[in-house]
A protein has these predicted regions:
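His/Asp/Glu-rich metal-coordinating catalytic cores
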Residues: 1-182
Length: 182
């Protein structure tokens, strides 16, 4: 298992939880570092998304370059994790890319995605004016949204409570790996 620091933390926790040795998990640095796996040279190209340290894979094999990206979000101000870097992508592709393989959840939407930075002030307004307790839900892996909610809650003078094992595990991993500072 080759992965960046945040995902390695989560993977090692899972391996330990199920009694498997965690030395199967290899932590790699982001691009331009590449790892050789069989005939492939693979680099982890930072790509903004709701999950910290998301990466597209730059795969060099037999003189060709392929780029494989899971879901992505072009966000210049993601709040957590690296912003999308068009210059880095231009540099990686300057000598040509044989194939770009990707998917995007909102590919058919006519609207540009919102940056996480634009969501915080709106959430803060809602939390500041709401009466009584406010409950917000999100995927535990959406660390950027968890941080946005926590920061907005704190600024609005509210107490923030995390519920759920996965939510706590993701926040712990974020703090341990430096993805979140507070």
């Amino acid at each position: 298992i080759y992965t960046r620091k945040f995902t390695a933390n989560i993977a090692k926790r899972k391996m330990d939880e199920y009694g498997h040795p965690d030395d199967a998990v290899t932590t790699v640095a982001p691009w331009p570092q590449q790892t050789t796996v069989g005939p492939f040279k693979v680099g982890f190209l930072p790509m903004s998304h709701s999950i910290p340290e998301s990466s597209s894979l730059v795969i060099d094999v037999a003189g060709d370059r392929l780029i494989h990206s899971g879901d992505f979000k072009i966000d210049m101000t993601p709040g957590v994790g690296e912003p999308y870097d068009p210059d880095l992508w231009a540099d990686v592709s300057k000598d040509g890319v044989k194939a770009l393989i990707c998917d995007s959840t909102n590919v058919f939407s006519q609207h540009a995605g919102r940056s996480e930075a634009t969501v915080g002030p709106e959430i803060e307004k809602l939390l500041g004016t709401a009466q009584g307790m406010v409950v917000a839900t999100t995927f535990a892996s959406n660390v950027a949204r968890v941080k946005t909610l926590a920061d907005a809650g704190e600024r609005a003078g509210r107490s923030v409570v995390l519920l759920g094992r996965a939510m706590k595990r993701m926040v712990e991993a974020s703090l341990e790996t430096g993805v979140m500072k507070d």
